[in-house]
């Protein structure tokens, strides 16, 4: 299928990025001296290598269900118009596999943008980025936590309340490194020699849009608020 082919392509390209960053840096370019753009791309690539196999597996299983009549995701198997006596699979399994890929995919797209915006703000503020190491660990932390929040998309799927509590907690925790980035962006702008040009206006618009969306995520990450809404 197309998703299986796309998953394979992403994994092959991702290996090129990871190997280049780890093994082909120029002399004197340690990991903690790399631009934040490269850190964002590197972390996003590692996420892609870990997340896309879930999409690949779910695509193969769905194809087998459709073509060969297996029952990975179909709860009831029907033959000649009648349901067979034994149970099939579960559509909830597909939701887990999809969102295990789907939520890290959000950060696969976002983390390179975070790195790019960080470097652009630094350049057009004519000031080093505030808290470089903090920014690096925030990017890495967001990437790591992204694999523990996927089921907040499934609060109404019938999961155990304890699982809902766990995923609500991890969803709120991931807001901490995210907020640190905004904090560092603002302090980089503070008393900087800012050039108000098209690039800086786009960066400021990015921050405002990101903060607006992030605030809603704090509320909707809570089961008690998300389910009624």
Regions found by a protein language model. Name each.
Residues 175, 198-220, 224-229:
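Alpha-helical transmembrane segments of multi-pass membrane proteins
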Residues 7, 38-45, 96-103, 168-175, ...:
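Hydrophobic alpha-helical transmembrane segments of multi-pass small-molecule transporters/permeases
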Residues 22-48, 124-141, 160-168, 187-205:
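Membrane-interfacial loop-to-helix junctions in multi-pass inner-membrane proteins
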Residues 1-6, 10:
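Single conserved hydrophobic/aromatic residue that forms the stacking wall/gate
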Residues 58-102, 124-129, 148-168, 191, ...:
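Membrane-interface interhelical loops and short amphipathic "cap" helices
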